[in-house]
A protein has these predicted regions:
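Transmembrane alpha-helices and adjacent helix-loop boundaries
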Residues: 279-504
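Extracytoplasmic small-molecule ligand-binding "clamshell" domains
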Residues: 45-57, 62-88, 93, 177-243, ...
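Surface-exposed aromatic
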Residues: 119-124, 189-193
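Short amphipathic alpha-helical coupling segments at ligand-binding clamshell hinges
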Residues: 130-144, 202
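N-terminal hydrophobic or amphipathic helices and topogenic motifs
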Residues: 2-5, 9-52, 58, 146-219, ...
Length: 504
């Protein structure tokens, strides 16, 4: 009989992993501390020739610069990543709106605007073509706000503030009536940002005032750019608010409101007048303070952890039950059941998990009213069941046919034979590989942010969008994922060990 108990070599697995984890943490902190010192001079468009320029992926700057052969273009998803590229020497400058960073944020991260172009881009909210009445209402509201002076007052309060974080949102009575679902994928002061659990910024205040004007109730959710676009087109969102530039190409896909602001393109470089790099200990303290303590940002982590655990546990339970059903179908004597199960398994194996998740949320289950969390549980359960069902089938088939015949000879019914003879042996055989699949399921939940679920990974994105710290939030969730995956593995190891002892 194979002994599945832990060997001494396996027992030291965690001991070996901890130094690696600490090394990863120290490396990230040192990377955050390091700073490139060579000044980059950009006083005009001509000065960018031959330089490495970072741009936000899919932005108007990406589109404009992608055809140039006289520069090296690097694409990044977040502002934090572009700042890190600047400090690590991977980019000489990055392009973004001139309002992308407040003066206080630029001072804190040691960057400055080297050159601001005269070219301006109008910003507007995007809606579907069937929402022309909402667009008309907003345009009317905006025109009245400009005429009354309210618009200018809002712009002065947010855009002239040295630190947008200190600007207070107006105390407006909550709007009621038809719900206006807003998708945002832009988290930068002073336009749109989270302070604790409160949405703030120029865009948000305009939307709140418009909601009261039009007797609508706001529901704001954060998506990435691709997710926000899909949410708008499928009806998961009614309005897309992300400081979107109004372009002729985008007008073919969405209906824009009148412009509510205009920004200029700017080149950001390291500020040679910035303070010197901090020491390791000071950087650690600042990282904890800025990413966890300020504005109670640790709550993003705890909320994301709760969401991750809910999805993981529910998917594990539902997926295991579904796997048992599919395994029964695969081992059925009815050919049509076997074929149906085989097609299902091949289908789930052939579709990337992220693609399946987005198809289920934005297409298949879009009109059901199910929450994003429920859709995620269903999607993960479907994929988990496809893989685990084959593990179950292989484990059952590993039990000799003679044992089943012996059970029947002893007077057991087929069900009793399976329950008391085959199942215990199959369970002992399948648990080690089941453990690996369960841990993979837990780690794969990190993609649920694509459907606007604030899990652990999305929590780190929210923190990074506020602090522009590229490393610290990621290291925090890396440690959490590692510890939880290790704990899950230990629980399943305990189950295997207990099963072996019970049989002895």
């Amino acid at each position: 009989m194979t002994d599945f108990t832990k060997t001494p070599r396996q027992g030291h697995h965690t001991t070996r992993c901890l130094p690696l984890l600490l090394t990863l943490l120290m490396t990230a902190v040192l990377a955050a501390c390091s700073s490139r010192t060579e000044p980059v001079v950009i006083n005009s468009e001509a000065d960018v020739v031959g330089k490495t320029i970072a741009v936000p992926t899919g932005s108007i700057y990406d589109i404009d610069m992608s055809g140039r052969q006289d520069i090296k273009l690097e694409r990044y998803t977040t502002m934090a990543d572009m700042i890190a590229a600047l400090k690590n020497g991977k980019a000489d400058a990055f392009m973004n709106d001139d309002i992308a960073m407040s003066a206080s944020d630029m001072r804190r991260h040691g960057v400055k605007i080297a050159f601001r172009s005269d070219r301006a881009f109008d910003m507007g909210y995007a809606l579907r073509f069937d929402e022309a009445d909402v667009v008309e209402q907003f345009n009317k509201f905006l025109a009245e706000a400009k005429e009354s002076g309210l618009y200018d007052e809002i712009c002065r309060r947010w855009m002239d503030a040295k630190d947008p974080n200190t600007v207070q949102m107006p105390q407006l009575e909550p709007a009621s009536g038809t719900e206006l679902k807003v998708a945002t994928s832009f988290l930068m002061a002073p336009m749109c940002f989270l302070e604790g659990d409160e949405w703030k910024g120029l865009e948000i205040e305009l939307l709140q005032r418009f909601a009261r004007y039009a007797h609508m109730k706001l529901d704001i959710k954060y998506y990435d750019m691709a997710g926000a676009s899909a949410a708008l087109q499928t009806g998961k969102a009614d309005l897309w608010s992300s400081s979107l530039f109004i372009t002729e190409e985008r007008k073919k896909s969405v209906l824009f409101t009148d412009p509510y602001y205009a920004s200029h393109e700017a080149y950001y470089v390291l500020d040679e007048q910035a303070t010197a790099s901090k020491g390791l200990w000071q950087s650690l303290k600042d990282g904890v303070h800025n990413n966890l303590i300020v504005e109670d940002r640790w709550k993003f982590i705890t909320d994301g952890l709760r969401e991750t655990l809910i999805i993981s546990i529910c998917s594990l339970l539902l997926g295991t039950l579904l796997a048992a059903l599919i395994c029964w179908m695969r081992m059925s004597r009815r050919r049509w059941l076997q074929s149906l199960a085989a097609v299902y398994i091949d289908l789930m194996r052939g579709i990337p998990l992220l693609v399946l998740l987005m198809i289920m949320f934005y297409v298949v289950l879009a009109q059901t009213g199910l929450s994003a969390t429920t859709v995620a549980v269903v999607s993960f359960s479907m994929v988990f069941a496809a893989y685990v069902s084959e593990m179950f089938r292989t484990a059952i088939m590993s039990v000799g046919q003679g044992q089943q015949e012996a059970g029947v000879a002893l007077g057991f019914t087929p069900l009793q034979t399976f329950r008391y003879i085959i199942l215990p042996q199959a369970a002992r055989a399948v648990l080690p590989v089941y453990k690996g699949e369960a841990v993979s399921l837990f780690k794969n939940t990190s993609i649920v942010g694509y459907i606007a679920i604030q899990d652990l990974t999305k929590a780190s994105d929210l923190i990074r969008s506020r602090t522009f710290d590229a490393f610290f939030p990621l290291i925090i969730i890396t440690i959490i994922y590692f510890l939880l995956a290790w704990l899950l593995g230990k629980v399943l190891d305990w189950a295997v060990k207990g099963k072996v002892k019970s049989e002895k």
